[in-house]
């Protein structure tokens, strides 16, 4: 059983080990070869060659993060719906019921967000 598992997944495991090794090697090479004391001019915010008028860190409205998180949640919902819709004929009643429960939970969450005013932009 274990040998069949290794036979099936050995190329993937080797690929992951090589990718992890190369990533670590690139990070180490970057740390070794990069300049340690960068020019202060390069650390300043770039504003068309002028001196920066103000701090480059601006306040960012939290609603943007909320919209991004809601987008990711509903984007993942669609990512789960496509394979489900394709295999709907093969999964039977249990697969249909589990997806309806999943959609119900997401719909309740969406209605809760709507009622709390998280989707209102004021």
UniProtKB/Swiss-Prot annotation:
Record InterPro entries: NAD(P)H_OxRDtase_bac/plastid, NADH_UbQ/plastoQ_OxRdtase_su3, NDAH_ubi_oxred_su3_sf
Keywords noted in UniProt: Cell inner membrane, Cell membrane, Membrane, NAD, Quinone, Translocase, Transmembrane, Transmembrane helix, Transport, Ubiquinone
Membrane-topology descriptor: Multi-pass membrane protein
Enzyme class, UniProt record, top EC level: translocase
UniProt key word Ligase: no
Subcellular localization: Cell inner membrane
Function: NDH-1 shuttles electrons from NADH, via FMN and iron-sulfur (Fe-S) centers, to quinones in the respiratory chain. The immediate electron acceptor for the enzyme in this species is believed to be ubiquinone. Couples the redox reaction to proton translocation (for every two electrons transferred, four hydrogen ions are translocated across the cytoplasmic membrane), and thus conserves the redox energy in a proton gradient.
Family: Belongs to the complex I subunit 3 family.
Subunit structure: NDH-1 is composed of 14 different subunits. Subunits NuoA, H, J, K, L, M, N constitute the membrane sector of the complex.
Protein name, UniProt field: NADH-quinone oxidoreductase subunit A
Highest classification ranks of the organism: Bacteria, Pseudomonadati, Pseudomonadota, Alphaproteobacteria, Candidatus Pelagibacterales
Gene: nuoA
